[in-house]
Amino acid sequence: MNPVVIIPTFVSSRKRYSGGSILAVYDHATPLTQPGELPRCLESLRKVRGLGQIIVLVVSEPGIENQAAEKVERIAAQFPELSVAVIGASESSLVQQRMEQLGMGRLTREIGLNGYAATRNLGLVLANIL
């Protein structure tokens, strides 16, 4: 069995959330302009022997999906000795497309980057593929 570490990241375009924001449901969203805890997490994973693939799931509010994924990719690039796959909206769409091709239907509510459960499930699907 190959170990897989799944790290969800929640990125917001603002420092504080207003009442009606979709992202307000996420407890610890990181502003787009700040690194957050991901660098520290990846730094600590450098010390783990036998570490397999690391999957970083990038959840963001609509309109900043690409910027959020680019931010996380820049952070992951600082750790070239780790095997890090950054999964943003584009990659999540490819997973959805493949599931539809396999006749599983459209499962965007259950598997994707919108909501804690769907994000967890996307990570589990990706880990199972590896």
Predicted regions and their residues:
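N-proximal low-complexity "stem/linker" segments adjacent to membrane-targeting elements
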Residues: 1-67
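Active-site-proximal specificity loops/subdomain of glycosyltransferases
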Residues: 68-130
